[in-house]
Structure formats: structure tokens, C-alpha cells
């Protein structure tokens, strides 16, 4: 039995994909057997990693787990491949539509599956803190402000929506503000405001590696699990 996990990285040309490629290559518990990019003219090998165009996804070699940070239009094909091959999937692709989220739930009946808007340890802690604050601050206003780089398309961010769900389940309706500026990696502020006082909970990411490390950690832990839809914090 191999001492490493064979890893497929889907969305390897993106910012997160590049971080995953670099960190996985430095981690002896992984071997990248395929990197899938949307704009590759044909399959090729770079630094020992086989690259495949998105159109060639069905031809990728065997893998033990897939990590996906891509775009919604490429997500469904990867999900179908993982189900067909009975392989776990870890995905951080945001902006999915309702049908894709339904497909995620259905796939969770057949494979171990983790979808998360944010894979940092700090964000997992923030979600927990926000839930606890929601329990204690019924009747307070809640505002969620998220800031990202100018190239991020979806708004509010997936992480902001996750934070909003954490308070919405406590009966608090959050308001969202989205900022797109410069090269901000990701800032999230959750503000609870009452009469004469307010509480602010903040998470700031200064490096994408925190998300990539978290995704790799989750990928290690999801292999061998029974089928199901797991949360990031379930495996942190």
C-alpha cells in the first residue's frame, strides 16, 4: 500500500490551485497525479505533474481524493467523475447554483464529500464564535462585511454567506456588504449592534496558503470516511 495519497487538483491554474500545487509537492503524504486547468491546449507534464485540459477530465489517471477550487461551470463534471469513480471530493468552489448544491447533497449519499467556502482554521473558529454570539444576542442587529480582491466575482462571498447562515439559524437576519478592492486576500467582519454597544468579530487572511493547507488537511482526513456531506470544521 502506498504511503501517500494520489491527489487530483481541479482548477490548478487559479490562485488557490497554484498554492495547492506548491504545498502538495512539498508534502510527502501527497502525490499529485493530475492537475486540471480550464485553458490547457492539450495534456502535458510540468515539474513532474501531468496537466489536463478540463475537456480531458475523464482521461485523468486514478486518484484517491480530489481538491477543487475552480469555477461553477466546471464543477459538475468533476462531481460526476468523483461519484463514478467512488472517490472523495473536497471543494471550495463558490458561486454554485441551487441545482449544483442539490447535486452535492445527492452525491454525499455515495461518496465522502466536503464543500466549504473557507478552509482556514481561523474561519472555522469564527463561525463557531458567531453561532455562540447569535445565541446570546437575540434582538441585536447583525452586519457582515466582506472584502476581497477586485477579481473575485461572487458577492457576497461564500464565507460571508456561511457566517450569515450561522446567525440566521439563531433567528437573526444578517445584512451583507461586499467590497472589491486591490489584492485583498479575504477579510470578514461580523458586527453585532445593540443599544449603546456593539461587538465585532474579525478574520483576516494575509496569505492563500492558509486555505490551501486547510484543504490538504481536510483531504487527508476525508479519505476512508463513510459517504456523507461533511463540514470543514467536522474534519479540522
Curated annotation (Swiss-Prot):
Organism taxonomic ancestry: Bacteria, Pseudomonadati, Pseudomonadota, Gammaproteobacteria, Lysobacterales
EC number of this enzyme: 1.17.1.8
Alphabetical GO biological process terms: diaminopimelate biosynthetic process; lysine biosynthetic process via diaminopimelate
Species whose genome carries this gene: Xylella fastidiosa (strain Temecula1 / ATCC 700964)
Compartment(s): Cytoplasm
Tree of life domain: Bacteria
Major enzyme class: oxidoreductase
PANTHER family documented for this protein: 4-HYDROXY-TETRAHYDRODIPICOLINATE REDUCTASE 1, CHLOROPLASTIC-RELATED, DIHYDRODIPICOLINATE REDUCTASE
GO MF annotation list: 4-hydroxy-tetrahydrodipicolinate reductase; NAD binding; NADP binding; oxidoreductase activity, acting on CH or CH2 groups, NAD or NADP as acceptor
Pathway connected to this protein: Amino-acid biosynthesis; L-lysine biosynthesis via DAP pathway; (S)-tetrahydrodipicolinate from L-aspartate: step 4/4
Family that this chain belongs to: Belongs to the DapB family.
SUPFAM superfamilies in the cross-refs: Glyceraldehyde-3-phosphate dehydrogenase-like, C-terminal domain, NAD(P)-binding Rossmann-fold domains
Protein name: 4-hydroxy-tetrahydrodipicolinate reductase
General function of this protein: Catalyzes the conversion of 4-hydroxy-tetrahydrodipicolinate (HTPA) to tetrahydrodipicolinate.
Catalysed reactions, semicolon-separated: (S)-2,3,4,5-tetrahydrodipicolinate + NAD(+) + H2O = (2S,4S)-4-hydroxy-2,3,4,5-tetrahydrodipicolinate + NADH + H(+); (S)-2,3,4,5-tetrahydrodipicolinate + NADP(+) + H2O = (2S,4S)-4-hydroxy-2,3,4,5-tetrahydrodipicolinate + NADPH + H(+)
Residue sites binding (S)-2,3,4,5-tetrahydrodipicolinate per the record: 149, 158-159
Annotated keywords: Amino-acid biosynthesis, Cytoplasm, Diaminopimelate biosynthesis, Lysine biosynthesis, NAD, NADP, Oxidoreductase
Amino acid at each position: 500500500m502506498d504511503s501517500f495519497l494520489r491527489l487530483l487538483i481541479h482548477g490548478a491554474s487559479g490562485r488557490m490551485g497554484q498554492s495547492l500545487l506548491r504545498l502538495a509537492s512539498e508534502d510527502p503524504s501527497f502525490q499529485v497525479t493530475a492537475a486540471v486547468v480550464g485553458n490547457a491546449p492539450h495534456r502535458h507534464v510540468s515539474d513532474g505533474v501531468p496537466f489536463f485540459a478540463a475537456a480531458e477530465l475523464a482521461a485523468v489517471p486514478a486518484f484517491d481524493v480530489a481538491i477543487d477550487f475552480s469555477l461553477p461551470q466546471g464543477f459538475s463534471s468533476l462531481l460526476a467523475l468523483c461519484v463514478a469513480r467512488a472517490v472523495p471530493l473536497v471543494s471550495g468552489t463558490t458561486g454554485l447554483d441551487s441545482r449544483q448544491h442539490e447535486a452535492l447533497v445527492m452525491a454525499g449519499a455515495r461518496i465522502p464529500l466536503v464543500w466549504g467556502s473557507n478552509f482556514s482554521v481561523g474561519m472555522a473558529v469564527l463561525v463557531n464564535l458567531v453561532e455562540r454570539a447569535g445565541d446570546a444576542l437575540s434582538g441585536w442587529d447583525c452586519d457582515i462585511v466582506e472584502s476581497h480582491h477586485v477579481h473575485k466575482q461572487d458577492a457576497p462571498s461564500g464565507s460571508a454567506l456561511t457566517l450569515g447562515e450561522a446567525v440566521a439559524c439563531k433567528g437573526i437576519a444578517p445584512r451583507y456588504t461586499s467590497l472589491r478592492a486591490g489584492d485583498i486576500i479575504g477579510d470578514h467582519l461580523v458586527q453585532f449592534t445593540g443599544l449603546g454597544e456593539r461587538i465585532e468579530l474579525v478574520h483576516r487572511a494575509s496569505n492563500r496558503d492558509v486555505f490551501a493547507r486547510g484543504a490538504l488537511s481536510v483531504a487527508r482526513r476525508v479519505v476512508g470516511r463513510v459517504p456523507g456531506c461533511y463540514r470543514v470544521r467536522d474534519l479540522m
